[in-house]
Amino acid sequence: MRSSKNVIKEFMRFKVRMEGTVNGHEFEIEGEGEGRPYEGHNTVKLKVTKGGPLPFAWDILSPQFQYGSKVYVKHPADIPDYKKLSFPEGFKWERVMNFEDGGVVTVTQDSSLQDGCFIYKVKFIGVNFPSDGPVMQKKTMGWEASTERLYPRDGVLKGEIHKALKLKDGGHYLVEFKSIYMAKKPVQLPGYYYVDSKLDITSHNEDYTIVEQYERTEGRHHLFL
């Protein structure tokens, strides 16, 4: 980790811009955040700059800003921190999210470093969400805490996770995430390990065109190893 600390400091800021569509509705979001990459937490303030108020649940977007901000994951010393080690060149990731009612999201993200600030460029496409489902009816109430399993494959790092959105009328709405993380230079890959995450919306206006989020994340080995 010593080499990454030459580039990534104890406290870092980031800027994020998302362009996307959900069931054909176009939108753009911009935000600024900050946090402590080696302690595993960060916050971000976001604003819908085009297409608001959004006609779908904000929750399907929220993981792409912070669950997508992988440089803020705390790692133990014996697990190589693939994303931090990729800087200053940075890395990219791709993600597919399959929702239990047939909705599908594909996301691409580019993470770079400019003048000591992380820059995230995100493209988001959501399709096939039923008009009477939780997403289009805005019936979700945030994500449960979750654990991603990560493993090296074909020179990149892959991640898989089963996440659950809480519903206003009780119960859960299930989503399968599959992600691929790709450094822009040769980087030491970790073995098989886990990352625990908890993402919360800490404030928002009535129509969710201004939102603040907070996330805690930490990598670990399996508890029985």
Curated annotation (Swiss-Prot):
One of its GO terms (biological process) is generation of precursor metabolites and energy. Contains a chromophore consisting of modified amino acid residues. The chromophore is formed by autocatalytic backbone condensation between Xaa-N and Gly-(N+2), oxidation of Tyr-(N+1) to didehydrotyrosine, and formation of a double bond to the alpha-amino nitrogen of residue Xaa-N. Maturation of the chromophore requires nothing other than molecular oxygen. There is a cross-link at Q66-G68 (2-iminomethyl-5-imidazolinone (Gln-Gly)). Gene3D superfamilies: 3.30.1300.40, Green fluorescent protein. The keyword Phosphoprotein does not apply. Fluorescent proteins have become a useful and ubiquitous tool for making chimeric proteins, where they function as a fluorescent protein tag. Typically they tolerate N- and C-terminal fusion to a broad variety of proteins. They have been expressed in most known cell types and are used as a noninvasive fluorescent marker in living cells and organisms. They enable a wide range of applications where they have functioned as a cell lineage tracer, reporter of gene expression, or as a measure of protein-protein interactions. The modification (Z)-2,3-didehydrotyrosine is found at Y67. Keywords: Chromophore, Luminescence, Photoprotein. Pfam families: GFP (PF01353). Coiled coil: none annotated. The keyword DNA repair does not apply. Thought to play a role in photoprotection of the coral's resident symbiont microalgae's photosystems from photoinhibition caused by high light levels found near the surface of coral reefs. In deeper water, the fluorescence may be to convert blue light into longer wavelengths more suitable for use in photosynthesis by the microalgal symbionts. Homotetramer. Belongs to the GFP family. This is Red fluorescent protein drFP583. It comes from Discosoma sp. (Sea anemone). The lineage of its organism: Eukaryota, Metazoa, Cnidaria, Anthozoa, Hexacorallia.
